[in-house]
Amino acid sequence: SHGVPIEINELALDADRLILTGGIIYHLLAGFGAGRKAVLPGISSYQTIQRNHCLCLRDEIGTGIKPEIVSGNLKTNLMHQDQMEHGAAADADFLVNVVANTHGQPAQFVCGHWEKAWLEGTKLVEKIYGVPINGLADCVIASSGGYPKDINLYQGVKTQDNAVKAVKPGGVVILVMELEDIHEPAEF
């Protein structure tokens, strides 16, 4: 319904059983990782992946990402909604996803129907990692939490995205990251 072609790997669709696996965590663009993301982008065509990611962008070129494309948002997130349509088209037989605790160890496995089990896992992510913001701050000091979350700017930008949501307009964000593997393009 979003104009993104449903092009899923035929090997997966022709298999006797399709079991989706992954780890559920906040996702910068899709709201949450895992679940339907095992289908799109997981086993979808390059064209489908690119078109799905374009749903994140504002209509006017150069104006960035739509404001509803944020971590934790599933209700108005077009990228997520499109991924759900692709997940339904794949008609997986089973899902096994894990939610890790703050030490990277399994807190809980969610298993069963690809959509229902995954949605239960997203609730646990909110419980473990969700932090209510009661007011915006003048200054936010944030850390990615160490390796591998701060290995490079590509990963570190996720911390920036969250920190900016907690600071007043015109406020200051101080990010603490090691950036051990910084090989991003200069413009990044």
Which residues fall in each region the model found?
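Conserved AWS/pre-SET-to-SET junction and N-terminal core of the SET lysine methyltransferase domain
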Residues: 122-124, 128, 135-158
